[in-house]
Amino acid sequence: MSRVLECSTLVSVILTKVKKGLKKNTPFLAIITFNDSKYCKLLIDKCLELDIHFKHYNLYNPNTRDVTSLIDKLNKDDEITGILLVEPLPKNIDKYACYDAININKDIDGVNPINQYYLSINRPNIVNSTVLAVIKILESYNISLSGKNVTIIGRSYNISRPLASYLINSDATVSMCHSKTRDLVSLLKNSDIVISVTGVNNLFKSSDLKDGCIVIDVGLGDVLIDSDNISYTPKTKGVGPLSIACLLENLVTSCKKLK
């Protein structure tokens, strides 16, 4: 019988921890966006709810230098303890130059290559919030990673690749699939855990999976539930709200590092 991996309780636990951290720390978040973002609105609403200080920079038609200059200014501002670039960036922007520019201790979503490197050698500094959300879900349900076959669908720099590093460090055997992968269904059939990060609606079906498979749907709708043989995260009140909670936890951590 299928099981829904409920995340609301975990969100509450993490936000309680964040509130406790706010009693001893005063973080200040800089949010950089390039268009209207539902994610940004949810994040700002949560900052207002928790009385977290923030500045929102919505850049209109910027070039790469505009963005890196702003990041450099925020790096030098002692009041700012966390910097977040909200994806997607405009196509004319060199996003990797922007990632490089963020101070590694203000990089609350772990996009700077140095933070990714530290994670790859199992010495994490700051880890991407969505990666943390995935790991916390698995841990909260006592799902061991050691020796498991884990398939990640999607090869994004921000999420899929650091997630693969985290899983490998936890002794999982990891396959990363993408648009050029042949015979995805065969890989899925052999997977103990599937983590989908594509945002492609109904990319695969639960009937493609073996009995007892765990599905973490980061893309919010990647899996079509057409059987009752798996455990899976819900489309709403799942990975998304948990990622925001983990991001705010990272913000408090960054504030501590910068003291």
Tell me the role of every PLM-derived stretch.
Residues 1-82, 86-89:
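N-terminal ligand-binding/catalytic initiation module
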Residues 2-12, 16, 82-145, 202:
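Anion-binding alpha/beta catalytic cores of soluble intermediary-metabolism enzymes, centered on
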Residues 5, 9, 13, 38, ...:
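Conserved active-site and cofactor/substrate-binding residues in soluble primary-metabolism enzymes
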Residues 34-44, 48, 125-204, 212-218, ...:
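Glycine-rich phosphate/diphosphate-binding loop of Rossmann-like nucleotide-binding domains
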Residues 54-56, 174, 232:
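Generic structural signal for residues in well-ordered beta-strands
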Residues 68-72, 185, 206:
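Short hydrophobic/charged patches on amphipathic alpha-helices used for structural packing
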Residues 98-116, 211, 216-258:
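Rossmann-fold NAD(P)-binding glycine/threonine-rich loop
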